[in-house]
Design a protein with these regions (language model features):
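N-terminal helix-turn-helix DNA-binding core of bacterial DNA-binding proteins
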Residues: 16, 20-61, 83-94
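Short amphipathic alpha-helical/adjacent loop interface patches that line ligand
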Residues: 45, 55, 66, 97, ...
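Beta-hairpin "wing" of winged helix-turn-helix
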Residues: 70-81, 87
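Alpha-helical residues within the helix-turn-helix
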Residues: 53, 64, 70-71
Length: 119
């Protein structure tokens, strides 16, 4: 019985952690400039200066946006000499994907059930 409660508690904590990660990522994605930066990073890793010239804002502003994206787990930085190069961190999008799927799974099942009933 204690083991069962422990497992349930662990699953609850994992769900809460995943939801917190999804919330952090969604909050970071709530700023259009950050979405634009992520779109640019889809083509490959880039330095802050490169990104700043492409989004037409200061390097300082891009650095602040990248810091938010990094804290949310959506990008990762790598030192390349004196520069930091940023890349999309695909794994950071998993909690968002799980969150969105949680809305679709019941609806898709209901649709499947309706289709099977009508046969």
């Amino acid at each position: 019985m204690i083991l069962s409660a422990s497992v349930k508690s662990h699953k609850y904590l994992l769900v809460k952690k995943s939801e917190a990660q999804a919330a952090a990522a969604l909050k970071a994605l709530g700023e259009p400039r950050r979405v634009e930066i992520l779109r640019l990073l889809q083509s490959g890793p880039q330095a802050v200066g490169e990104l700043a010239s492409r989004v037409d804002v200061t390097q300082q502003a891009v650095s602040l946006h990248l810091a938010v994206l990094e804290r949310a787990g959506l990008v990762e930085a790598r030192k390349l000499g004196a520069r930091s190069v940023y890349a999309v961190r695909i794994a950071g999008f998993a909690p968002v994907e799980q969150f969105v799927r949680s809305f679709w799974a019941p609806r898709l099942k209901a649709l499947k059930d309706d289709i099977e009933k009508s046969r």
